[in-house]
Regions:
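C-terminal membrane-cytosol helix-exit motif in multi-pass small-molecule transporters
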Residues: 92-111, 296-300
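Short amphipathic helix-loop junctions that connect adjacent transmembrane helices
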Residues: 145-161
Length: 311
């Protein structure tokens, strides 16, 4: 953990120093590795230390802070001139400040090595949970990349206005998971996941129809953004509830793997659907993907594959 905390700000600060694209590839790879290390260990520790009766609220707060960090990152890149490289140095400084409370954390769970770590194993054991992570990655990356393109015909080709639609999406990602986390500590989490899936499918399916109405546009983007991040926060909450002990670390690694896989596939797959079937496929295709996930989640829960694993 400490190795990752040291390397991360150094690698970020070195980006503006080198103008060689191959060195940039190397630095970006290093940043991805160490940032994922911090990400994974942080999630495992939070989930291991959180009590079940408060797990939903804690994970929801964590998810909202992730969204806040993404928003702050965008603001940094938009407010600080690219030519000076100042954005990189500010980001490196934020990484250093963030490392301070993590550096001295000593009340942490000690996880033993787990034999037979396999992403496929967790996909078969808990397809609904791994699917929630994949859904978040798929929808998050696809909406972030393609929403401005989808919005262009509705705003008369105004690029600035189409880009601002992402802000409404982000506002939902920031705030709604807090409400979902509060609900998760009071009601059945499995049913809540089903409800969120239904809301996301309906909202995505209706989005192309109502997008030319500004008030409805903002409302639906807010709801969609919140449901996307709720896939992640509620899935992570269920993960901590269902997997205990040393299995939690490897299960969480699989959770992040499927999220990353969804992020890789989302933009090109949805983009290809828009090319083949038109602009409205942006919402309709993602609604179809959400419906498939909903069926898988209900089926895996009915078959008893969502069960506590204590090793």
């Amino acid at each position: 953990m400490r190795f990752c905390l040291v390397v991360l700000p150094i690698a970020i600060a070195l980006l503006p120093v080198f103008q060689n694209i191959y060195i940039w590839f190397l630095l970006r790879f290093i940043i991805g590795v160490v940032a994922t290390g911090v990400w994974l260990l942080s999630e495992v520790w939070i989930n291991a230390l959180a009590e079940d009766q408060h797990r939903g609220k804690i994970i929801a707060l964590y998810s909202s802070l992730i969204s806040l960090g993404l928003i702050v990152g965008v603001l940094i890149s938009s407010l600080i001139p690219i030519e000076t490289g100042g954005g990189f140095y500010v980001s490196a400084g934020i990484a250093v400040i963030s490392a301070i409370p993590l550096w001295k954390m000593d009340d942490l769970p000690d996880f033993d090595a787990v034999e037979d770590i396999s992403f496929y194993r967790y996909l078969v054991t808990a397809p609904g949970l791994m699917g929630s992570s994949w859904m978040m990655g798929f929808l998050y990356a696809a909406t972030a990349a393609l929403l401005p393109i989808f919005a262009l015909p509705f705003v008369e080709g105004d690029y600035a206005q189409s880009s601002r639609t992402v802000a409404w999406l982000a506002s939902g990602e920031l705030t709604l998971p807090l409400f979902v986390g509060w609900l998760a500590d009071r009601y059945d989490k499995t049913r809540l996941m089903i409800y969120i899936s239904c809301v996301s499918v309906i909202a995505l399916a209706i989005l192309p129809v109502i997008f030319d109405i500004p008030v409805m546009r903002f409302l639906f983007l807010f709801i969609i953004g919140g449901s996307i991040m709720s896939f992640y926060s509620l899935g992570l909450t269920l993960l901590g509830q269902e997997f205990k002990g040393k299995v939690l670390a490897s299960a969480n690694a699989s959770f992040i793997f499927f999220l990353s896989l969804g992020e890789i596939l989302g933009p090109p797959v949805v983009g290809a659907a828009m090319d083949l079937f038109g602009n409205n496929a942006f919402g309709w295709f993602m609604a179809l993907i959400g419906l498939i996930y909903l069926i898988i989640f209900i089926g895996s829960n009915a078959s008893g594959k969502l069960k506590i694993k204590k090793i």
